[in-house]
A protein has these predicted regions:
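Glycine-rich phosphate/adenosyl-contacting loop at the front of the ribokinase-like
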Residues: 1-56, 65-66, 240, 305-311
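Glycine-rich beta-alpha junction loops
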Residues: 9-11, 59-60, 84-87, 188, ...
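Hydrophobic anchor at the start of a short beta-strand
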Residues: 2, 52-53, 78, 162, ...
Length: 311
């Protein structure tokens, strides 16, 4: 079983428009609404890959019902802890003319320390039966500064591989706690470390304690910096579609590969292929495995020794 901690669950709303023009009116061609947030999206892709998974997180208010109902429809097991306030909405406006998505992310409800204690207790009860853990998404208001450290150390105490996909100080905390994999995108990595070069910034996170750093490069694919070496993988062509769930699909592939003990080049190839398959879907957290299998042999993985990478 692969567990996912989704600290900031969302109700994801996706609007598709012909072309996004700021300051003008738009006719929405398609609307999607589903349970989301990065951790939920990762869990959805893991389930599509055939893995048992449980989502742990927080929900509150009127939107909580829509979230839990959608999880039930999708067959996703969950332990969502009730908090005061309203589960946030995350709105993506996808421009069909170029495939770019503009995101509007609410902050989410305040989560007090007592609710975090509850989540950690539930996680600890499940970790003995788990093969891996993903902690994915932003941390909600009220979260203690060391929340990521506690989650990573809890997984380590049970010898469970952990991947963390978050930003800012929490990313540095995850690295310092010795996370097996951290997965920032290029901009997040550079901003968080204050280092101007991707390879050097990844090296800095590894110096702080992260065992491996996988960097999303957008349309350029992904790069992995690991104890076994460094590789870059790229999709065969730029894809038009909805990119909002591509990073979450990649995280699912990476943790599935880690749980299976796959070599790093294979993990990276699968991550880029699954990410590309996710772009073709209208909403995040969904993949068509036929697309994934079609992309796998097209992904070029190269070992690299360069001191830097372009964004």
């Amino acid at each position: 079983m692969i567990l996912t901690v989704a600290p900031n669950v969302a109700l994801d709303i996706t609007y598709q428009v012909d072309q996004l023009i700021p300051g003008s009116n738009h006719r929405v061609r398609r609307v999607g609404e589903r349970a989301g947030g990065k951790g939920v999206n990762v869990a959805g892709v893991l389930r599509a890959l055939g893995h048992d998974t449980v989502v742990l997180g927080f929900v509150g208010g009127e939107t909580a019902g829509a979230v839990t109902a959608d999880l039930a429809r999708g067959g996703l097991a969950h332990e969502l802890i009730a908090v005061e306030g309203l589960t946030r909405r995350s709105i993506a406006v996808v421009d069909s003319s170029n495939g770019e998505a503009t995101l509007f992310n609410e902050a989410g409800p305040h989560v007090p320390a007592t609710r975090w204690d509850d989540l950690e207790a539930r996680l600890a009860a499940r970790l003995p039966r788990a093969t891996a853990l993903v902690v994915s998404g932003s941390l909600p208001p009220g979260t203690d500064d060391d929340a990521c450290i506690r989650l990573v150390r809890l997984a380590a105490a049970h010898r469970v591989t952990v991947l963390v996909d978050t930003v800012g100080p929490a990313l540095l905390q995850a690295a310092a706690a010795g996370a097996d994999i951290v997965k920032p995108n290029a901009g997040e990595l550079l901003d968080t470390t204050g280092v101007g070069d991707i390879a050097a910034a990844a090296t800095e996170l590894r110096r702080r304690g992260a065992k491996a750093v996988v960097v999303s490069l957008g349309a350029g694919g992904m790069a992995a910096f690991t104890p076994e070496g460094s590789w870059r993988a790229a999709p065969p062509t730029r894809l038009a579609g909805n990119p909002t769930g591509s990073g979450d699909a990649a995280a699912a592939a990476l943790i599935a590969g880690a749980a299976a003990g796959a070599p790093w080049p294979d993990r990276l190839r699968d991550a880029v292929a699954l990410s590309a398959a996710a772009v073709l879907q209208p909403t995040a957290g969904i993949v068509d495995l036929r697309d994934y299998r079609r992309f796998v042999p097209q992904i070029l993985v190269e070992e690299h020794h360069a001191s830097g990478l372009d964004r």
